[in-house]
Amino acid sequence: FLDSALLGLEYALLAVGVYITFRILNLPDLTVDGSFTFGMAVSTVLCAAAHPFAGLLAGALAGAAAGVVTGFLQTHCKIHPILAGILTMSGLYTVNITVLGGPNVSLLDAPKFFEVLGGKAPAVGLVTAVIVVLVTLFFQTVGGLCIRAAGSNEDMVRASSINTTAVRWAALALANALVALSGAILAQCQGFGDVGAGSGMIIIGLASVIIGEVICGRRGIVIGIV
């Protein structure tokens, strides 16, 4: 049971990222499988170089970059959101192999972030809780409200002289940063990074969102993210 709970915590930020795109922004984003592995690959390389905390941060930034690429394809290249996500995900497969330098990399002898924070469960729980609180607070700010409004009625937001392109980019960057951070955490907790680890992550994320809504219902942004 404890192992299952820990695995759930490791995937928690993945679910939050999927929730942001599919429920708040109302946009299908299939970049998830690629950005999850991208975050894992970057985290693995830096962790192997004895920089575990930098690996988490860089992994999240890598995911944000992947989200921006998807946003660019949608807004500037006028590609359908589903196809844009597939294109980014496919391109990231080659990038991930290049970053890792092979199909997988072991981290058995490398220092991990949770070793400094008192073990896997406390460390992952702390990081997840802090990120969830920060994301929840962000969606109460002007920027967060713009994303929520764009998901409800993009035409109205555009008529209010708000840059909907920037809003979409920001939402996709945030969502994929969280997804990639989940991959970065998982890599260090399981002790290796694998180029095929992202396969099926979008299904896991969507299933988490749907199960959460069945249990808690749609009771607003705070309950939704939690």
Describe every region a protein language model picked out:
Residues 81, 85-140, 169-170, 190-195:
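Transmembrane helix-bundle core of multi-pass membrane transporters
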Residues 1-51, 73-77, 210-219:
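Single transmembrane alpha-helix segments in multi-pass membrane proteins
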